[in-house]
Structures are given as C-alpha cells and as structure tokens.
C-alpha cells in the first residue's frame, strides 16, 4: 500500500500495528523508552532484545543518538557489577547492544566451538559481554561468534537499541518501533517509510506525528532525486 503511494488509515490499530500520536519530541522519546522497557516485554511478551527502534535521522531529540542514550539509561543502567569504558562522549558498558559500523577484516573472533577466525562486518549487531579496563578491551557476542575489541577500536562501534532506517536495510526484527517526527525533508521519503515498516516481522508501532508519515508517502519523486550521499549529509546536519 505505502509503496503504491496509498495512505493507510493510521487510526486503525490492529494486532500487529499500533499508532501512538506524540506531537512533542520529549513525549515521543518517553513513550518509546516505556514501550521497550515495560509495555512490550510485560504485555506482549516481547523481550527488549527483540525490539528494534528505528528513526529516519541520527540527529535531534528523536534521532538515534539521543534515543540510544535514553534507552541505555533505561535498559542497561550503571551498576557496580557492570564495568564500562568512556570513549569520547560514549559510554560502552557490559550488557550494551552495539553495531559494527564499518567492515573490519582483522578483528579476531571465536565461535561457540572455540574455532578462531577474523572479520566483523558493517551492520553486525551484538552485545557487550565483557569490559576489561585493565587489559583495555571489550568482548562483543554476535551470537555465532565473540569478537575482541581493543579500546582503540571503539570508534567502530555504536549503540544499537535505536538505528537509522538506512542502517536497518536488509534486516528484520520481531518488533519495530518507528519514531516519526519532523526532520530534514530529504530524509522523509516514501522509500524510507517503506523500508522501515517492512523491517517488522510481527509488530509495528509508529510513535510520533501522523502528518510526517503522510508527507513521506507523498514524497516519492524526491526519494528518486536525492543521492545516498546527499541524504547522509542531510542527516549529519539534522
């Protein structure tokens, strides 16, 4: 429907789709955090590690950078039992959900059988399972392998509770929470919205401004005209 330029009835909630109207960025963030921390795990039995928050943009109150800070505070707060490392402005803590943001063919890993190999790739998502501040490394569990990161390599990791829609391409998640608030026009395209909603396997929740979704559906020509580079530059300045 969206891909054909048709407007769904966002007022019709169903078993696999819900719309929560939040016109202010702060209330949108609060709702997303509450959904991830309590409402979906308790009411729908979907654990937080099977929920993916998506946003068109990195920047702004409802962008992924701020969402990840808020979600880390709610889902993996500081604890004496969890070691952490401050890298730039980012705190990496045992238990954090992280994503590899560039191909690295030299990272050493071991699989569950103890077999060693090398290489972690852009878009791989895992969990920090060990933070060794004395030896200065993190271990990240990517489900099929555990990779070792020296602290000097932490610029290759970002938190991954919230991802941009662009970074989610090619992946699917049990539940998707989509943050929709005004950002740069070239990020609000039909293609971005279609990509976001098709990431959800069982449940999609839109949180934000319905008008943004309608604008995205109508913005088809622009999605063709702007290059990926221009979209990325717009995101960096939003």
Predicted stretch roles:
Residues 1-118:
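Conserved helicase motor core of P-loop NTPases
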Residues 122-238:
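C-terminal accessory regions
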């Amino acid at each position: 429907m969206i891909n054909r330029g048709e407007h769904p009835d966002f007022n019709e909630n169903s078993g696999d789709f819900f719309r929560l109207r939040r016109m202010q960025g702060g209330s949108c963030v609060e709702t997303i955090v509450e959904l991830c921390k309590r409402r979906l795990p308790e009411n729908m039995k979907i654990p937080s590690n099977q929920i993916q928050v998506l946003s068109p943009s990195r920047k702004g109150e409802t962008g992924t950078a701020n969402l990840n800070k808020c979600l880390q505070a709610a889902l993996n707060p500081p604890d004496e039992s969890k070691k952490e490392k401050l890298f730039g402005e980012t705190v990496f803590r045992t238990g954090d959900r992280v994503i590899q943001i560039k191909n690295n063919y030299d990272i050493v890993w071991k699989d569950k059988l103890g077999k060693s190999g090398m290489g972690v790739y852009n878009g791989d998502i895992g969990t920090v399972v060990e933070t060794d501040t004395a030896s200065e490394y993190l271990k990240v569990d990517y489900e099929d392998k555990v990779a070792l990161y020296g602290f000097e390599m932490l610029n290759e990791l970002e938190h991954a509770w919230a991802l941009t829609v662009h970074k989610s391409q090619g992946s699917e998640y049990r539940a998707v929470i989509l943050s929709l608030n005004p950002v740069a026009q070239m990020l609000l395209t039909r293609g971005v919205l279609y990509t976001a909603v098709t990431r959800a396997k069982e449940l999609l929740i839109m949180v934000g401004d319905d008008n943004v979704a309608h604008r995205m559906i109508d913005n088809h020509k622009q999605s063709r005209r702007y290059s990926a580079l221009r979209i990325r530059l717009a995101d960096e300045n939003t």
